[in-house]
Amino acid sequence: MQPTHTLTRLTVIGKLIIASSFFLSLAVQAQQCGQTAPLINERLSYMKDVAGYKAENHLPIEDRIQEEKVINSAMAQAESLGLNGESIKPLMVAQINAAKAIQYRYRADWLSQPEPGWQPKPLDDVRANIGELSTKILEQIAEELKTCKPAEMGDKAHFINTIRQHNLTSADVEAIFSTFNQVKLK
């Protein structure tokens, strides 16, 4: 009789392990959903350094050539990740517009309230970090579109509460959110 009890216990233990694995995979998947906003927030966190570098070197905030390069690169990367490249363009434009708005607002603030002793990071380093984050953002969006429910990745309250930067308005974040929801797979 003992072998039957042992077999029953093993069966129960096996079922518990399978159930645990299933719920663990759901928990991991849920953690991966809705993670685009923190990456966008981190990307925008570099704008003070960009503004400072440009102010220090008497460079304009508008850099159409750089903007075009960023947009074209993002569209090509998006396509390689299984995203519709055209659908990513409005999101990139919204992020660039928000980035420029942050830079303009910093420059305006510094006219009346300079920050003595603060030094921006070198622009080449900052752009490299921004480029890495842009890639991570696209990878995350592709992953979320493939594995997450729309409500998990497009939770407006979570998105808006996550993207918080000095000199970033709620209208800037709303524009990013609305274009984020337009991104599609191929």
Swiss-Prot record:
InterPro entries, per database record: Chorismate_II_sf, Chorismate_mutase-related, Chorismate_mutase_periplasmic, CM_dom_sf, CM_II_prokaryot
Domain of life of the native organism: Bacteria
Annotated substrate binding sites: 43, 54, 63, 99-103, 127
Reaction catalyzed: chorismate = prephenate
GO molecular function: chorismate mutase activity
Record localization: Periplasm
GO biological process terms held by the UniProt record: chorismate metabolic process; salicylic acid biosynthetic process
Pfam family, one: CM_2
Pathway the protein acts in: Metabolic intermediate biosynthesis; prephenate biosynthesis; prephenate from chorismate: step 1/1
NCBIfam families with a match to the protein in the record: CM_mono2, PRK08055.1
Function: Catalyzes the Claisen rearrangement of chorismate to prephenate. May play some role in the pathogenicity.
The protein, known as: Secreted chorismate mutase
Organism of provenance: Yersinia pestis
Gene: pheA2
